[in-house]
């Protein structure tokens, strides 16, 4: 397990410290660190503070902010940027872009779980400019060209 430095901006998080729900959980829940119930109207996007900052400090890691499946499926609440990327050298508070793609207003409660944070390995590449690629079986075919019977 990788140890990560974390800052708590909201004292309420001491009672519900971010953690993994089960031993097999890939992500830990991020909570809405808001002071009062906040409505997210259909089509609206709001930036919601998570109350935490992390510092991964190693360019071999990044964190991704992902939507919670229940909020998206049941209420239409997904991430406005689809996936949030937290670079290893970012030290500011993590903000969650919540987009209501549903057709009814959603009431977001203080400290409600709104997203998941997953830490992932990163490989930084160096690029070699070429005129042509070595031929592959797939070539330039894309957009549904694979997996056909």
From Swiss-Prot:
Q: GO annotations under biological process? A: dUMP biosynthetic process; dUTP catabolic process
What's the protein here called?
Answer: Deoxyuridine 5'-triphosphate nucleotidohydrolase
* NCBIfam families tied to this protein: dut, PRK00601.1
Pfam families on file: dUTPase
Q: What is its EC number?
A: 3.6.1.23
- Which of this chain's residues are annotated to bind substrate? 68-70, 81, 85-87
- Catalytic reaction list: dUTP + H2O = dUMP + diphosphate + H(+)
Q: Does the keyword Magnesium apply?
A: yes
State the needed cofactors, names only. Answer: Mg(2+)
Record the organism: Nitrosomonas eutropha (strain DSM 101675 / C91 / Nm57)
Family according to the record: Belongs to the dUTPase family.
Q: Which Gene3D superfamilies match?
A: 2.70.40.10
Keyword terms of this UniProt record: Hydrolase, Magnesium, Metal-binding, Nucleotide metabolism
One of the record's GO molecular function terms: dUTP diphosphatase activity
Tell me the function of this protein. Answer: This enzyme is involved in nucleotide metabolism: it produces dUMP, the immediate precursor of thymidine nucleotides and it decreases the intracellular concentration of dUTP so that uracil cannot be incorporated into DNA.
Q: In which pathway does it act?
A: Pyrimidine metabolism; dUMP biosynthesis; dUMP from dCTP (dUTP route): step 2/2
């Amino acid at each position: 397990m990788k140890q990560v430095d974390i800052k708590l901006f909201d004292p309420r998080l001491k009672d519900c410290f971010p953690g993994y729900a089960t031993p097999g959980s890939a992500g830990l829940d991020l909570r809405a660190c808001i002071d009062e119930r906040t409505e997210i109207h259909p089509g609206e996007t709001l930036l919601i503070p998570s109350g935490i900052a992390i510092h991964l400090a190693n360019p071999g890691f990044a964190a991704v902010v992902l939507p919670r499946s229940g909020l998206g499926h049941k209420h239409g609440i997904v991430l406005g940027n689809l996936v949030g990327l937290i670079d290893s050298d970012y030290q500011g508070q993590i903000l969650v872009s919540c987009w209501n793609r549903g057709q009814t207003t959603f009431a977001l409660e203080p400290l409600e779980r709104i997203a998941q944070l997953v830490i992932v390995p990163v490989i930084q590449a160096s690029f070699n400019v070429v005129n042509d690629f070595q031929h592959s079986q797939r070539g330039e075919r894309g957009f549904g060209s694979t997996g056909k019977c």
